[in-house]
Amino acid sequence: MFLQFFIWGAWYTTIGNYMSAHGMSSQAYLPYTVNPIAAIVAPFFLGLIADRYFATQRVLGVLHLFGGVLMLLVPGATGSPGLFVFLILLYNLCYMPTLGLANSLAFHNISDQEKQFPLIRVYGTIGWIVAGLFIGFVLSRFSAGQLPDTTPLPLYTTGVASLLLGLYSFALPHTPPPGAGRPVSIRSIVGIDALRELGSKSFYVFIVSSLLICIPLAAYYAYAPIFARVGVYDVGTSNVVTSVFPNPSSLMTLGQISETGFMLLMPLMFVRLGVKKMLLVGMGAWVLRYALFAMAAPSAVFWLIVAGILLHGVCYDFFFVTGQIYVDKKSTPAVRGQAQGFLVLVTYGIGMLIGGIIAGKVYNGFKGAATDLTLAQWAKFWPLPAAFAGVVMVLFAIFFRPQTQERPTQASAPTPS
């Protein structure tokens, strides 16, 4: 699990700055659209092929080996944006199914899922954090004075780590295909059966709100690392925090550190607030985060930028994890897996795809022919996702009426951030 998310964290927070530094700033949003495309395709691969015919650890190994080779080819395509993004797409088509496979393998080989899996899953978040710190403290020694985020080193790191994990996967405990011999349909893979069973006004409001709130979220994943570079490192900010987090990707790990801390507070907050207020707090934190970025931009106010990154723990835990708990409580055992898969499809698939495209178009509209937005332009960029998230929050507050205030069970997020 550590390597599973180390791999993702090594490239996901650096690819935008790398593309901006190599004449591809106008295409920097595209990796954040091909990733959701792969998230949409992954359930079909898992449901129709991987879960029915092959041992989980073998599929995991093969996909990581293919993905590692593809990622090692990516830097060589730097001069050709189309080929560069196409290779990123192929890589993601290999990687995204491994998220479900890794969870499936873990669940099959533990006896108490509620107690043991969260302890395993937390190593994924740690792996993401270590990836950012590795880039900041290790790769910086080999980047010839440049920010390592702008060099191909993180991409090579991802490729090598993928190959290592691919080889290691074959040594994992044998895990037979969980769906062998069972009928499967497109309806069950997409989650239509679960949607019909869970259908209620409050559930539909939750699903639509989840999709809509992921549209402004895409701006954070795609452009917060670039904003951190422009607003912190390009202006030469030097303090105790930048000495500990010396590059954008390491600074962004503050969000995952915050996520881990707020995860510990969730049971207490859930008892006090219930589902609706927890979800509203998460949405409100997104509005506040983008507002802080907008206020920080004109004068590159470091602590406002850091505060916005630290809010990621509230943004992610209070909305996504709470949402998973809500879906879990609404579901029967027969459709629970379908329901969670449908939530991932709607959020990390459709929502993030739409959001990535919109964020890229807006960013390029501000940027024009320049390489980066100016600080003044960033101050105009961030209020847009803030306003969008604010509208979704207000509509959710008005129309979401849960029948009961469900209490939490253990839940695990499909992604670290």
Where are each of the predicted segments found?
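A membrane-interface helix-boundary motif in multi-pass transporters
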Residues: 137-160, 361-389
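Central cavity-lining transmembrane alpha-helices of secondary-active solute carriers
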Residues: 30-50, 250-266
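Hydrophobic core of transmembrane alpha-helices in multi-pass small-molecule transporters
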Residues: 2, 70-71, 81-101, 105, ...
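Helix-loop boundary and gating motifs at the non-cytosolic
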Residues: 1-39, 203-209, 213-240, 244-251, ...
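Juxtamembrane intracellular "pre-TM" segments in multi-pass secondary transporters
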Residues: 172-208, 233-240
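Multi-pass alpha-helical transporter architecture, strongest
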Residues: 74-78, 161-174, 381-417
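C-terminal ends and interior cores of transmembrane alpha-helices
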Residues: 65-79, 284-298
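Cytoplasmic membrane-interface "Motif A"-like loop-to-helix N-cap segments
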Residues: 51-65, 271-283
